[in-house]
């Protein structure tokens, strides 16, 4: 059994750590509320621009490069969204695992994978493994800003527009010399953590480009719902100036850019929730450990007192016996 001083030192150390984890838990909780508020604030714009795109899609030819799957694609960009800070449980590990699965699948399909990373933890992870990263952006994982995420958003859109046979212009954050042109790609995938609830966050893969045909599905589902409800709503007839194809050309990049920014916002909420859960678990474990150590310390203290009493009684008995013999 450890001596009493060692046990008390351990209790003080655990209590000190507990204060840190509790503070981190409270900070993460407040950040979750803020992050959820930002996600909710961005939702109306995203919904409206999607409605406009639905109208444009129904009136245009839908023959747009950002909507069309390219035959014989050669290169696929994968953006891995990680955190800038640790103490978030399995948040980053799960994303890295999901990204590895995606990269393996793309390689089996014949694509050359071009990896991009956001977040210091992702940069450090791939650097330690000596895996090449074509571009990295850090400093905004907990509080994404529209301007701070500009370069990564524009590069992914420009790189896809250029195709694997063309080149895109250099942007800050890319792992090449300034001014050098960058080879484009034919697909863009984003691996990030989806915020499901305060207790659940899961890594997901989202194909950013080409845009998956969810617009037509959404229109069909809403139409089926209206029929099942017995409603016969007449959709308004819009006129587009100059024409639907031109407007689609202008709005699609904005839609994709906004979609990627929404992913950063959701990942920020998931990061804070994951950190809050990890810190709460650490705080609870520290509380239990202090209870166990205190129980052991009390037993050690009781044993020490018992031993001291025994020694005193024994000593007194010895002195008493010595006096009688005299």
Curated annotation (Swiss-Prot):
F-type ATPases have 2 components, CF(1) - the catalytic core - and CF(0) - the membrane proton channel. CF(1) has five subunits: alpha(3), beta(3), gamma(1), delta(1), epsilon(1). CF(0) has three main subunits: a, b and c. The keyword DNA damage does not apply. One of its GO terms (molecular function) is proton-transporting ATP synthase activity, rotational mechanism. InterPro entries: ATP_synth_F1_ATPase_gsu, ATP_synth_F1_gsu, ATP_synth_F1_gsu_CS. It comes from Corynebacterium efficiens (strain DSM 44549 / YS-314 / AJ 12310 / JCM 11189 / NBRC 100395). It is a peripheral membrane protein. Transmembrane segments: none annotated. The gene is atpG. Its main location: membrane. Gene3D superfamilies: 3.40.1380.10, ATP synthase, gamma subunit, helix hairpin domain. Coiled coil: none annotated. PANTHER family: ATP SYNTHASE GAMMA CHAIN, ATP SYNTHASE SUBUNIT GAMMA, MITOCHONDRIAL. The lineage of its organism: Bacteria, Bacillati, Actinomycetota, Actinomycetes, Mycobacteriales. This is ATP synthase gamma chain. Pfam families: ATP-synt. The keyword Membrane applies.
